[in-house]
Amino acid sequence: MIKKTILLILCVALIAGLVGAGCSSAPPPVPLTEPIPQRANLVASIQINEILTDEDLIEAYDEAEKDPDMPETIEEAMQEIEDEIGIDPRDFYEAVVFSDTECEDGYWGAIITGTFDEEELIENIEQEIGEELTSINYHGYKRYADEAGENGLCFFSDDTFLIGTLDAVEDSLDVAAGDAMPLEGPVVDAYEALGDVWVRVAVKLPPESMEDLTGDEIPVESETLERVEALGASLKKVGQNVSLEIRICLTSPVLAEALKVILIGVKTYFQLTADLPAEAVDVMKKIVLSRSGSCTVIMLTATVYEIEDLVEAIQEEED
């Protein structure tokens, strides 16, 4: 139930962001300061409090169609989550998440900042899992774990804690203690370039996953996809203005420029020949393609009225 509610909230957050789109300038880079281990191939950050207290998001969630068992309002959703885990999600400011997406057994961690009571948080977790957490001294940190040794928890400070699979938690603590090097390279570069935004994510995808993303409609050679070092995406909202950015980072500026030219051609082709509603064509015209270093950059700018018209047109097509 809670997972379903959270997923709906995140979906509405993205929709609300796109609905208000109107800013095309990229934000300045923001460095990654959290202890992210080298094993990770994905890094993401979410400004939790900003999203959950945004008036447009609240309105979008409250008006969205929901299943009968879903909370009617975002206030009800927050209360249900607090009743079950003992914490109001709006008390969390930011979550920086990392993972190894290719690990079949699961490898992930989340560094969360906010206002919370350490003892109360531990009690709530123990009550939720039905067992007591054990703790050891790990690099001077008190590292908690469940009985199976699968998941871990550690408090960096009064307002920051680390939670995740035990191996990911310990790897992060190794980095924090200076016993291991942090994640570096294209994924971090792409993540930092996305700047201070609502949501930002950067990931290294295998070529087969890139092929799934592009599909048959986008004529990009497999050799080019093999040279994609990182894929980044971000969403930022300021007032009624939101920017959506996608960065495809390759091994050289030449490849990035070539991919930009291909995508411009694809955009033009769809605008002229695809059987799309006029509203969709209008939004496609708002897509701006450029190159920044070795990255092909896609920016989308649209007004609330254009997106509303597009949503209505899509609904009419489905009917």
Language model regions located:
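An internal, short helix-loop-strand segment that often contains or flanks glycine-aspartate motifs
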Residues: 45, 55-89, 132-241, 245, ...
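Solvent-exposed coil/turn segments that connect beta secondary-structure elements
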Residues: 49, 113-117, 158-159, 166-168, ...
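Secretory targeting signatures
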Residues: 1-27
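Long, low-complexity, Ser/Thr/Gly/Pro-rich intrinsically disordered segments that act as flexible linkers
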Residues: 26-130, 134, 237-241, 288
